[in-house]
Each structure stands twice: as structure tokens, then as C-alpha cells.
From Swiss-Prot:
Cellular component aspect of the GO annotation: cytosol
Glutamine amidotransferase type-1 domain boundaries: 16-250
Pathway this chain belongs to: Amine and polyamine degradation; putrescine degradation; 4-aminobutanoate from putrescine: step 4/4
GO biological process: putrescine catabolic process
CDD domains: GATase1_2
Stated name of the protein: Gamma-glutamyl-gamma-aminobutyrate hydrolase
Family membership: Belongs to the peptidase C26 family.
Keyword Signal among record annotations: no
NCBIfam families assigned: PRK11366.1
This enzyme's EC code(s): 3.5.1.94
Species of origin: Escherichia coli O157:H7
Length: 254
């Protein structure tokens, strides 16, 4: 049996919650299981690790960074807008932005999902639509909370893959496919540092990658949902873990 301790170490950002009155940081199992099934070892990263001296000690131990989805939203002041965000998680923002900036500098692989994509957009100088439902030209991208969870994560709309990018390299035989959709915010302006990898039929950005980086991919949908059952999802996670293995080899050569 393979020793999981030999697998790439993937740092996973958590979300702030309250449990019976106590401040708590949590991770949904589906995000962790997707990494394990793809051959990685997920390690939860407490928000306190955003402190620069701790982050500096942490980064050499990580082979990849995983930014999962969340019920919370990125604070608007981080992308130049005024107003409060009722569903904010400032400590997650702080850690995620620090991790993204460090990973881009050190060429550490990143896989970002839903809120994670939005963090990647903001960290590289872009901005977000705060309420997609107020954009009349866009589809309804939110899930129906009254439906069972399995139906909330069912395919909702197609995405069209842009040619010549990371996503098309990972999925060379698949230029369009159906995805689930469970988000109220989305990319508005994408920095020149990013390549748009896929769009939904209404033109909304559904995937991005960082230009001149070995693997920094963000997707707006949720491939972690039952990832082992869907070939496209497995390919994304396995591509991420393969990039992490290449990063390990690069570190060993230095």
C-alpha cells in the first residue's frame, strides 16, 4: 500500500465559523477527499499562519496550495469598492491573499475553486461582480437552497473552454461541458496577469489561470463534488497533483 506521507503536501485554506458560540475554522470533507483521491495529502492551514514570519516558515513545507469554496465573500475594499460585505471572512482573505502572492513568486501550484477563483482574480488586480443576480444579461448562477444538496450540485449550464490555455491542455478532447453552479458573485474585471480559460454561455468567466506559471488554475464551479465519479473532475485534481509532484522535483534540484 502506498504511504500517504510520501504524497505531495497540499495546504488548504479554511473558513471561519462559529460552533456553539466558539470561533471555529472548518473545511468540508468533499474538498479534502478530492485531494486524497487524486494522490495528495491535504493539510488544513489556520488563519493565524498569515503572520509573515510563520508564513515564511510554512511555505517550504507546501507542495501545493488549495483554495476551496466558501459561503463567505471577499471583502470589497480589496478590489477597490466601497461598502460592507455581510458574509465576509477577513482572516481568510488575509491568509489567501498572502498565500497567492507567495505561490506566484515561488511558482507553487495553486488550485482555486469558487471563492478561491475570486480570490485569485482579486489578488492579481481584478474585481468582482458583487451580485450577479443584478446583472440582467447574466444567467442565474446561484443554487436553489430549497433543493436537496445532490440536486444543488447537479449540472446547471455549459462552459466553453478557450483554446491554447491550461484547461484545454488538461482536457484536449473536451471544448465544452456542463458544470454545477453555486455562486452569487463572479469575476468582473480580469487582470492581464490572468488568462481566461472558460466562459459560461452568458459570457461570465468560469475559469482562469496565471500566465507564465506552471499551474495556477481557478474554476468557478465545484469539481470537488463527487470528484472520483466524474472523469473531468478527476483530470483537474490529478493535473494539480502532478504539478505539485513536478514542484517537488524542482525543489530537490535546487
Amino acid at each position: 500500500m502506498e504511504n500517504i506521507m510520501n504524497n505531495p503536501v497540499i495546504g488548504v485554506v479554511m473558513c471561519r465559523n462559529r460552533l456553539k458560540g466558539h470561533a471555529t475554522q472548518t473545511l468540508q470533507e468533499k474538498y479534502l477527499n478530492a485531494i486524497i483521491h487524486a494522490g495528495g495529502l491535504p493539510i488544513a492551514l489556520p488563519h493565524a499562519l498569515a503572520e509573515p514570519s510563520l508564513l515564511e516558515q510554512l511555505l517550504p513545507k507546501l507542495d501545493g496550495i488549495y483554495l476551496p469554496g466558501s459561503p463567505s465573500n471577499v471583502q470589497p475594499h480589496l478590489y477597490g469598492e466601497n461598502g460592507d460585505e455581510p458574509d465576509a471572512d477577513p482572516e481568510r482573505d488575509l491568509l489567501s491573499m498572502a498565500l497567492i502572492n507567495a505561490a506566484l513568486e515561488r511558482r507553487i501550484p495553486i488550485f482555486a475553486i469558487c471563492r478561491g477563483l475570486q480570490e485569485l482574480v482579486v489578488a492579481t488586480g481584478g474585481s468582482l461582480h458583487r451580485k450577479l443576480c443584478e446583472q440582467p444579461e447574466l444567467l442565474e448562477h446561484r443554487e436553489d437552497p430549497e433543493l436537496p444538496v445532490e440536486q444543488q450540485y447537479a449540472p446547471s449550464h455549459e462552459v466553453q473552454v478557450e483554446e491554447g490555455g491550461l484547461l484545454s491542455a488538461l482536457l484536449p478532447e473536451c471544448s465544452n461541458f456542463w458544470v454545477n453552479s453555486l455562486h452569487g458573485q463572479g469575476a468582473k474585471v480580469v487582470s492581464p496577469r490572468l488568462r481566461v480559460e472558460a466562459r459560461s454561455p452568458d459570457g461570465l468567466v468560469e475559469a482562469v489561470s496565471v500566465i507564465n506559471h506552471p499551474f495556477a488554475l481557478g474554476v468557478q464551479w465545484h469539481p470537488e463534488w463527487n470528484s472520483s465519479e466524474y472523469a473531468l473532475s478527476r483530470i483537474l485534481f490529478e493535473g494539480f497533483i502532478t504539478a505539485c509532484q513536478h514542484h517537488i522535483a524542482e525543489k530537490q534540484r535546487l
